[in-house]
């Protein structure tokens, strides 16, 4: 839960922009080209625009935002995107309420408060590795905090590797004219993760406190080969095959975690 600083009396609207970005990876091994294509088809169906819309709608509810508009699209041959425009204020029908009653905060800050997701399934052409990446951005303006949705998003997707960035930009001014560049306490994104998630993941931080930039990346601690095999069981493979596949998967996980090629 976000720990707020003592409540401030603000001059006008809270102009702080808080942005949380996720890169979530699912890694899989599919032995044949046909199996790899079936994995892509499976992921494409499991995380189509309808499912992603439901996940992001849940996120909006969790952080206490009001949905203004939803745009979604499935792509050919694969992938999907969803964008939800949100506001801190309740949605008001201009036709019923009259333009003069529409909150300036809603109109002014519509372009800054949004939730988006894009998916990227892909496969290695020879080595049997298949990956699924979901990029999620939650940007809010005002007192709404995207950090409230951290645990839900990690649990909602098949998260072998998670890379998260959180930053706070802008300022809000109190009634005495003093500027405040952040309105809650934080020294790590890990502060807002559940004990269950912390127990399952190895985590690494790079934070720039004076710039209000927080970066955490993590991967699952335990490696269970069966969890990474698509349409196959480890017990049906020879010892040599298991060792080869395990080495390929662990290398892929390390490279995605560190963001660079390690085998060259």
From Swiss-Prot:
This is S-adenosylmethionine decarboxylase proenzyme. Keywords: Autocatalytic cleavage, Decarboxylase, Lyase, Polyamine biosynthesis, Pyruvate, S-adenosyl-L-methionine, Schiff base, Spermidine biosynthesis, Zymogen. It catalyses: S-adenosyl-L-methionine + H(+) = S-adenosyl 3-(methylsulfanyl)propylamine + CO2. Heterooctamer of four alpha and four beta chains arranged as a tetramer of alpha/beta heterodimers. The keyword Lyase applies. The gene is speD. GO terms for molecular function: adenosylmethionine decarboxylase activity. The record marks 112-113 as: Cleavage (non-hydrolytic). The keyword Lyase applies. Belongs to the prokaryotic AdoMetDC family. Type 2 subfamily. Is synthesized initially as an inactive proenzyme. Formation of the active enzyme involves a self-maturation process in which the active site pyruvoyl group is generated from an internal serine residue via an autocatalytic post-translational modification. Two non-identical subunits are generated from the proenzyme in this reaction, and the pyruvate is formed at the N-terminus of the alpha chain, which is derived from the carboxyl end of the proenzyme. Pfam families: AdoMet_dc (PF02675). Its EC number is 4.1.1.50. Its cofactor is pyruvate. The modification Pyruvic acid (Ser) is found at residue 113. It comes from Xylella fastidiosa (strain Temecula1 / ATCC 700964). Binds 1 pyruvoyl group covalently per subunit. Signal peptide: none annotated.
């Amino acid at each position: 839960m976000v720990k707020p600083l003592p409540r401030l009396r603000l001059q006008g609207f809270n102009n702080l922009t808080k942005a949380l970005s996720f890169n979530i990876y699912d890694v899989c091994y599919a032995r044949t080209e046909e199996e790899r294509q079936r994995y892509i088809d499976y992921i494409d169906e499991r995380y189509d625009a309808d499912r992603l819309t439901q996940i992001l709608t849940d996120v909006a509810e969790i952080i206490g935002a009001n949905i203004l508009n939803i745009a979604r699209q499935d792509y050919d041959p694969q992938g999907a995107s969803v964008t939800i425009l949100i506001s801190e204020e309740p949605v008001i029908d201009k036709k019923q309420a009259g333009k003069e009653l529409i909150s300036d905060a809603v109109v002014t800050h519509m372009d800054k408060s949004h939730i988006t997701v894009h998916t990227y399934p892909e496969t290695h052409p020879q080595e049997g590795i298949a990956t699924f990446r979901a990029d999620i951005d939650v940007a809010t303006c005002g007192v709404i905090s995207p950090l409230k949705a951290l645990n839900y998003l990690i649990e909602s997707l098949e998260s072998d590797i998670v890379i998260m960035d959180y930053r706070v930009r802008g300022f809000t001014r109190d009634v005495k004219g003093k500027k405040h560049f952040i309105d809650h306490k934080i020294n790590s994104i890990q502060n807002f993760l559940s004990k269950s998630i912390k127990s399952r993941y190895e985590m690494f931080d790079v934070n720039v406190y004076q710039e209000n930039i927080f970066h955490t990346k993590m991967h699952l601690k335990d490696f269970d080969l069966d969890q990474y095999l698509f349409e196959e069981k480890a017990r049906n493979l020879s010892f040599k095959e298991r060792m080869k596949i395990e080495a390929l998967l662990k290398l892929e996980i390390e490279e995605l975690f560190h963001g660079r090629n390690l085998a060259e």
